[in-house]
């Protein structure tokens, strides 16, 4: 092989590597943008089942993680049948992390996801309702109703006023009737959910969601 041919091959290999790197960087950038648009908090951008496998999943939540992964493997069927997840347990038990892992799988499959904490959801509705232009609020409520996977983080952390409870009832009822999945994380126990909200909210969540619980101390590590 002469020097010219060898150089051409080397240049081709080098360019191929560059293109591969560029494509991977674009894929990551696109994924980050999609996570942002879905409302995923920046702290959880790195959450994925792949990361759990690579870094190790704590034994205390392994069973819950396995169930979440099983759910994620059948996203299309779960979306069509309106099946969701309800993660409950004490703080720091990876409930939000696992919910985001599921969300990431859905986003990578180009399925609609919207993640929002309950306090933020209701604060947003209050703020928008004070605006004379109600179009913004209608668009927000349409997204809550119609997105394929709605993730309600910190369910039960919202202030329990009557209108708040009614709004929660309306959201759950609408998605239940239209067979839209809801994925919930909460520090409340199932019996506390039943006591906080009207009976039909609890019944609808229980009948359409895989209930996954975790008990014990927080798994979060203190900053060094």
Model-derived features with residue positions:
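Loop/turn-to-beta-strand initiation segments
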Residues: 111-112, 146-150, 178-184
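Walker A/P-loop nucleotide-binding motif
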Residues: 77-99
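Short glycine-rich substrate-engagement loop in P-loop NTPases that contacts/grips substrate
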Residues: 61-68, 103-146, 159-162
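Conserved catalytic network of the ASCE P-loop NTPase/AAA+ motor domain
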Residues: 77-79, 106-107, 142-145, 173-178, ...
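N-terminal pre-Walker A segment at the start of P-loop NTPase domains
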Residues: 50-78
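Interdomain "pre-motor" coupling segment immediately N-terminal to P-loop NTPase/helicase cores
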Residues: 1-42
